[in-house]
């Protein structure tokens, strides 16, 4: 039989097909198995799928479809959403060094003095030193205990305000945020600063635009968009005002220290700014801490300490009002434990086990932030999927807190689910990590928890609450806002009735 060579077109087609196979094999070998996810659109990526409602609800809905490790294209960014305890453990513990970086956020770049804060500084020597300062000096258990009298004073101020406005409509959200701001202001600055109202108003603006879903963050290469969207001038305006306040605070502390040195009198540390300045002086030969870095860390502590405590307390009170059975049980516990007292102290509430369950259940349904962000420092794997270097990792706390495979009746507020359970929220159990986990876990857990426990216990002890204007508990709006933290969309308005009179 006569043998014929294939025609040139057939040969070229076969060669082209073979080369495409080789190219695909090399690419798949280099990239590994990518996580599943919805198909992105040009330019937008998957942003159009997050536009309907709050982003964390939209992301959670997609996670239910595509699994616990899901890829998204957010504008120009490659993002991987992790929504199971097992996958979260791989990020925060198994491969914690590979994911020890925080993704860049444009608002943070401006507000944190070029990433000088503890929360947002790049992983490296500076971050390690600041982490050590925060754990051993600024927010140690000893330091948190030393602020007990401040917490008691400011919570009593809240109780007194509610008592004086008994029967009137109270904006409880506003009063809770005022209380936590006063606590952190006195702990950080030594007193309530003169510009505290302006300071907290500026802070609220930052929290709304600093969640990492702004145009400047989603399209980082398009730097010309920053002034066009108004984000850059807005941030620069906020930073200028906030820097002026922080500069005055730090300068005032430095003047007091110099005066003490000049008079040969011992300077007594009183607040967190003093602690930072003392550390800078004691370690100036090994570690140079600039004034801007002191301001960055101070802002870090104020924003995280105040916002986390207040948001969690606001949601706890909302859930207690929405669930009168739980409210009654919490009230009975604290009223029995502190029976006969006209005011209660922190030492009186250490054994309120049901209150601790209420707080734990609040963290499950209402983590202060819906996502814990990380960035892959190198190519690695999660759940058998290859994660490229520089990918933005979003640990979806919102999804895990509402996952029916983890929690029975996940949408129900049931503190009893934690009775007899060893699950805590301090980074050891990855189904409940409101403060994150691993090396970059929030160092202020003890500080925030102490504020929340005392504030809730005092309100439960002294008052009964109802909704204004004859509203039933079923009418209580539980809608959220989206930002760096997830507050209530509408402020919590209540009417209080005194059950146990307060005497300061």
From Swiss-Prot:
Enzyme Commission designation: 1.14.14.-
Compartment(s): Membrane
InterPro entries: Cyt_P450 (IPR001128), Cyt_P450_CS (IPR017972), Cyt_P450_E_grp-I (IPR002401), Cyt_P450_sf (IPR036396)
Pfam families referenced in this protein's UniProt entry, alphabetically: p450 (PF00067)
Stretch forming the signal peptide: none
Major location (coarse): membrane
Residues engaged in binding heme: 442
TM regions (residue ranges): 2-22
Cofactor(s) required for function per UniProt: heme
Enzyme class: oxidoreductase
Membrane association type: Single-pass membrane protein
Tissue spec: Mainly expressed in fruits and leaves.
GO cellular component: membrane
Reactions catalysed: dihydroniloticin + 2 reduced [NADPH--hemoprotein reductase] + 2 O2 = melianol + 2 oxidized [NADPH--hemoprotein reductase] + 3 H2O + 2 H(+)
Pathway: Secondary metabolite biosynthesis; terpenoid biosynthesis
Gene3D superfamilies xrefs: Cytochrome P450
Sample GO molecular function, one term: oxidoreductase activity, acting on paired donors, with incorporation or reduction of molecular oxygen
Domain of life the protein comes from: Eukaryota
Alphabetized UniProt keyword annotations: Heme, Iron, Membrane, Metal-binding, Monooxygenase, Oxidoreductase, Transmembrane, Transmembrane helix
Function: Monooxygenase involved in the biosynthesis of limonoids triterpene natural products such as azadirachtin, an antifeedant widely used as bioinsecticide, and possessing many medicinal applications including anti-tumoral, anti-malarial, anti-rheumatic, antibacterial, anti-inflammatory, anti-pyretic and diuretic effects. Catalyzes the conversion of dihydroniloticin to the protolimonoid melianol.
Family as reported in the entry's similarity comment: Belongs to the cytochrome P450 family.
Name used for this protein in its record: Melianol synthase CYP71BQ5
Organism: Azadirachta indica (Neem tree)
Gene this chain is encoded by: CYP71BQ5
């Amino acid at each position: 039989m006569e043998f014929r060579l294939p025609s040139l077109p057939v040969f070229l087609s076969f060669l082209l097909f073979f080369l495409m196979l080789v190219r695909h094999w090399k690419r798949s070998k280099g990239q590994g198995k990518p996580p599943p996810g919805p198909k992105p659109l040009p330019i937008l990526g998957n942003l159009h799928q997050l536009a309907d409602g709050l982003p964390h609800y939209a992301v959670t809905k997609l996670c239910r479809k595509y699994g616990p490790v899901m890829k998204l294209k957010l504008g120009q960014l490659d993002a991987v959403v992790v929504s199971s305890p097992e996958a979260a453990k791989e990020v925060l513990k198994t491969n914690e060094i590979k994911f020890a970086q925080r993704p860049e956020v444009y608002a943070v770049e401006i507000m944190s003095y070029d990433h000088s804060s503890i929360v947002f500084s790049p992983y490296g020597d500076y971050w390690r030193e600041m982490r050590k300062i925060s754990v051993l000096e600024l927010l140690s258990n000893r330091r948190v205990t030393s602020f007990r009298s401040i917490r008691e004073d400011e919570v009593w101020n809240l109780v007194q305000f509610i008592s004086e406005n008994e029967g009137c409509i109270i904006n409880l959200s506003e009063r809770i945020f005022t209380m936590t701001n006063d606590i952190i202001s006195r702990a950080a600055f030594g007193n309530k600063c003169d510009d505290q109202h302006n300071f907290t108003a500026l802070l609220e603006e930052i929290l709304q635009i600093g969640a990492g879903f702004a145009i400047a963050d989603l399209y980082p290469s398009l730097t010309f968009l920053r002034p066009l969207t108004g984000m850059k001038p807005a941030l620069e305006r906020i930073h200028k005002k906030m820097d002026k306040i922080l500069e005055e605070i730090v300068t005032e502390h430095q003047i007091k220290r110099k005066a003490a040195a000049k008079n040969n009198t011992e300077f007594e540390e009183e607040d967190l700014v003093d602690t930072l300045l003392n550390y800078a002086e004691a370690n100036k030969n090994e570690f140079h801490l600039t004034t801007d870095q002191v301001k960055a860390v101070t802002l870090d502590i104020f924003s995280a300490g105040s916002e986390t405590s207040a948001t969690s307390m606001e949601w706890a009170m909302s859930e207690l009002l929405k669930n009168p059975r739980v409210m009654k049980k919490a009230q009975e516990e604290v009223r029995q434990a502190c029976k006969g007292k006209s005011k209660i102290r922190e030492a009186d509430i250490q054994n309120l086990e049901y209150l601790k369950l209420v707080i734990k259940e609040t963290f499950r349904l209402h983590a202060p932030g819906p996502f814990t962000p990380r960035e892959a420092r190198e190519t690695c794997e999660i759940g058998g999927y290859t994660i490229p270097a520089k990918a933005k990792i979003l640990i979806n706390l919102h999804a895990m807190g509402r996952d029916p495979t983890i929690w029975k009746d996940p949408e129900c507020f049931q503190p009893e689910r934690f009775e007899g359970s060893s699950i805590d929220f301090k980074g050891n159990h990855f189904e409940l990590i409101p403060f994150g986990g691993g090396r970059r876990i929030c160092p202020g857990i003890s500080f925030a928890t102490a504020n929340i426990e005392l504030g809730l216990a005092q309100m439960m002890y002294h008052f009964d609450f109802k909704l204004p204007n004859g509203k039933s508990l079923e009418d209580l709006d539980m809608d959220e806002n989206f930002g760096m933290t997830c507050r209530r969309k509408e402020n919590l308005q209540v009417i209080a009735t005194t059950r146990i009179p307060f005497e300061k």
